[in-house]
Amino acid sequence: MTSLAVIVPSRGRPQNIKDLIESFENTKATCDLWVVCDEDDPTLDQYKALNLDHLLIYERTQKGMARPLNLAAREIFALGKYKYFGFLGDDHRPRSMYWDIDWTIVLDQGVGLVYGNDLLQGENLPTAVAMHGTIVQELDGMVPDHLLHLYLDNFWKTLGLDIGALTYLPETIIEHMHPLAGKAQVDQGYVDVNAPEVYDADKIVFDKYINSDAYRELVRRLM
């Protein structure tokens, strides 16, 4: 039985999930893949046609991945089945064999976060990440409430550094097939979450939370 659940929010990109499944198979991943979709996604039937082992569907109330990621993390955590929780975008592609084992080996050492090399941000930002279940429990999710999309990786890096438990694995490749890397076309999903108003809103929420008593208490409990 795997100890790692990897959550992948996705909208309008069923082909990406198909490609991601192939990447999991090619790298001999044994973690459980949980795909999260919006109930109003016009391509929802195509996701269902993939016959995924784990598909969660939620009402969409805002743009971005933060809300569906947190809803899924809470629901999956409540199952009591997993020790560790990961996030991949639907535009990430694991390339290293047994990459998920690399993650769990680190997390077996204690409460913390781990990420690999996405060949775009590298060590700079954990665009794909895994964390100990204790973090999910204490945070009641994987990111602070009210974030939308763009500052999720900033939060993970900040939290990992502040609790002294952030591990970067440069040889564990989880390629980010992003337009900024010239590896994908800009679609409506990218347009929506990279809009200036989303960036501005996320920065305000991020800065406020990182400087809050709630965040300082979170760090204290995790150390």
Q: Which residues are covered by each model-predicted region?
A:
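Short beta-strand/loop segment that forms part of the nucleotide-sugar
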Residues: 8-9, 30-41, 57-59
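Short, acidic, metal-binding catalytic loop of nucleotide-sugar glycosyltransferases
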Residues: 19-31
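A short, glycine-/small-residue-rich helix N-cap motif at loop->alpha-helix starts
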Residues: 60-69, 73, 122, 148-150
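Active-site nucleotide-sugar/metal-binding loop of Leloir-type enzymes
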Residues: 70-84
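Short beta-strand-to-loop acidic/aromatic patch adjacent to the donor-nucleotide binding site
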Residues: 82-93
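Conserved donor-nucleotide/metal-binding helix-loop-beta segment in metal-dependent transferases, i.e.
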Residues: 97-113
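Short beta-strand-to-loop element that shapes/binds the nucleotide-sugar donor at the catalytic cleft/hinge
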Residues: 112-127
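C-terminal catalytic/acceptor-binding lobe
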Residues: 154-223
